[in-house]
A protein has these predicted regions:
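Charged interaction scaffolds used for protein-protein
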Residues: 4-9, 24, 28-38, 58-106
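Active-site-adjacent beta-strand anchor residues
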Residues: 12
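Short, surface-exposed beta-strand-loop junctions and turns on beta-sheet-rich folds
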Residues: 18-20
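Short, hydrophobic/amphipathic alpha-helical patches that form generic packing surfaces
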Residues: 45-55, 79-82
């Protein structure tokens, strides 16, 4: 998944490297924190998860400091979390967006 944050494009990957990087940097379980971030809409956890899903040379703190606003991730939070959860938990299916309303017949 590609995401553009304040004019910079990043490629996100939800793979084994993502899980390992998260564990090494934040000493926490990425899958547990991913579910927590989704349920609590936790911006800091989402930033940590996003940072580990991209290939960034800067430290986490330097990466955060490179953005103009602390809310740079807010517009993309839901789509990033959905991408990451589908990548790490195969039992989760991405939501299909549809303009059609479902109807049932009796």
């Amino acid at each position: 998944m590609k995401v553009k944050l304040e004019g910079r494009e990043y490629e996100l990957k939800a793979n084994g490297r993502f899980l390992l990087k998260y564990q090494e940097i934040f000493k926490a379980n990425a899958v547990v924190d991913l579910y927590k971030s989704i349920s609590e809409k936790d911006l800091l956890l989402t930033e940590k998860l996003t940072y580990c899903a991209i290939n960034e040379e800067l430290s986490f703190e330097e990466w955060l400091d490179s953005f103009e606003t602390p809310l740079f991730l807010m517009p993309y939070m839901d789509s990033i979390l959905e991408y990451l959860i589908v990548g790490v938990d195969p039992s989760v299916k991405a939501e299909k967006k549809s303009d059609e309303k479902k109807t049932t017949s009796n």
